[in-house]
Amino acid sequence: MKNSIQVIHTGSKGNCCVIWDSQENGLLIDLGVSFPKVNKSIEYKISHICGAVVSHIHKDHAEYIPVFASNSVEVYSNANVREKYPECRLLGRRNTIGAFTVFPMSVPHDVPCEAFLVKTSDDVRILYITDTSGMKWLCKRVNYLIIECNYDTDTIIDRKYNENYTTGSKYFNHSSLETCLDYIENMDKSELKGVILWHSSSTNLNKARAKEAATRAAGIDNVVLAKSNLIMDMIDDNF
């Protein structure tokens, strides 16, 4: 699991992934998956985990904070999350968490929410964006992008027509395929090596279309849809 991004799970039932560096130090992002499941997925190497960062307070991202904290995992998040979960440490503008440096960036959602730029001990840069209607921050020298691609407008329109389907307002707080593509097209892709499409709806996204469009926008072949137990190896010129 060295030099990799490991997806534990993503979706409305829970979100969690791990960033691993070359020394097998790990950083957890979001804690919406149970401790036993995460621990099993990482082959019981919880002692290798430097800490965890949580994007926002919603259950599918934060539910298991107390359990991880009680198992000696230092958890960091914003003030809104800390108010409910006092076990959390408050994120600053720049955070050293073991072998990782984490820069949080506020993004629009229906609760305070953070995107994260993570820098590993090997100077690999991973940008994580979830649960937002749009991301204004254009970070330079991103090597790997984990970005929400929750739904696409055409699929929702088709469902409304064929199934009398009503989305409600919740989708306005998530990234559509169109929003995701707009970000990829406008970001600095000079050092981009991989993209993971995150938090995708099982019913409101044409996943084949999303992957094809994101691959075209990114200009690289290493574009995948997140799924449980997916591992994306991170390749760096220094390795």
PLM features: residue spans?
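Active-site environment of divalent metal-dependent phosphoester hydrolases
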Residues: 57-62, 82-84, 110-112, 135-137, ...
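Active-site regions of enzymes building and remodeling cell-envelope glycoconjugates
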Residues: 70-75, 85-104, 142-147, 221-223
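Catalytic core of the metallo-beta-lactamase
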Residues: 95-148
